[in-house]
Swiss-Prot record:
It comes from the Bacteria. HAMAP family: ScpA. Coiled coil: none annotated. The keyword Cell cycle applies. Belongs to the ScpA family. One of its GO terms (biological process) is chromosome segregation. It comes from Clostridium perfringens (strain SM101 / Type A). This is Segregation and condensation protein A. The lineage of its organism: Bacteria, Bacillati, Bacillota, Clostridia, Eubacteriales. Keywords: Cell cycle, Cell division, Chromosome partition, Cytoplasm. Transmembrane segments: none annotated. Participates in chromosomal partition during cell division. May act via the formation of a condensin-like complex containing Smc and ScpB that pull DNA away from mid-cell into both cell halves.
């Protein structure tokens, strides 16, 4: 039999080499012919030695495992325990191979996303001038952490998703369509009609997630300006916005 190696490629590890041999021999991971794979695996390691390439202990351990499975398959099955041990060893190897293949696909996808992200250009944040007057002494952000805001945002996105139709329709959104200043004025108008409003009332009116985010940021800006205060009676509960009345 001729040596099956045509050229040597760089492998990330022993599982990478095994997957290459399985694909080369047109085998399924669940139906590997150990005797064929073992011989070719050892030939790869031998060639790596000839080329003075570094062979890590992981490759050697995998080779020993393959040899052990192969040798046990050739020995007569005297005891049931030996047969069970051999099957378990091969089963564990198959499971690890399947798991490695999944991670390899995920890493390839993430690598593609990393490359495509470099081609994305984002808009600079809007600069909002904050008026110094009408400030209250109470600091409404005192007991609020970034984690609280993140959880709150996720809850709002969940509510938004429940309000939408099951069939999602792709829309093109203009970059400047939703502005924080417009949403600030929108919230001011709503609070002028009634002093206390629920934030969830505005979600069904939003066309997309971006509009929900901009509305949420407008609410934070009004809190920062001390024009409103928010009340939440429980974690992930309803957000009540109340207009702050400053005594002159």
């Amino acid at each position: 039999m001729e040596m099956p190696i045509i050229k040597l490629k760089n492998f990330d590890g022993p599982f990478d080499l095994l997957l290459h041999l399985i694909k080369k021999n047109e085998m399924s991971i669940t139906e590997i012919k150990i005797h064929e794979i073992t011989k070719q695996y050892l030939e790869y390691i031998a060639l790596m030695k000839e080329l003075d390439l570094e062979i890590t202990s992981e490759f050697i351990v995998m080779a020993a495992t393959l040899i052990e499975i192969k040798s046990k398959s050739l020995l007569p099955k005297v005891k049931v325990e030996d047969e069970t041990c051999e099957e378990d060893l091969q089963k564990i190897l198959m499971e690890k191979l399947q798991e490695y293949k999944k991670f390899k696909k995920i890493s390839a996808y993430l690598r593609e996303r990393e490359l495509s992200t470099g081609e994305v250009f984002t808009k600079k944040a809007e600069i909002i001038e904050v008026e110094a007057d009408n400030k209250l002494d109470d600091d409404y952000f005192k007991n609020i952490t970034m984690l609280d805001l993140y959880k709150l945002y996720n809850n709002l996105m969940r509510i938004y998703g429940e309000k939408q139709n099951v069939n999602v329709m792709e829309k093109k959104i203009s970059v400047d369509k939703y502005k924080i200043t417009d949403k600030i004025n929108f919230l001011r108008d709503k609070l002028s009609e009634k002093s206390v409003v629920r934030f969830s009332e505005f979600i069904p009116q939003c066309e997309c997630k971006l509009e929900v985010v901009v509305t949420f940021m407008a609410m934070l800006e009004l809190i920062k300006r001390s024009e409103i205060k928010v009340i939440q009676y429980e974690n992930f509960g309803e957000i009540m916005m109340e207009k702050v009345i400053v005594n002159e």
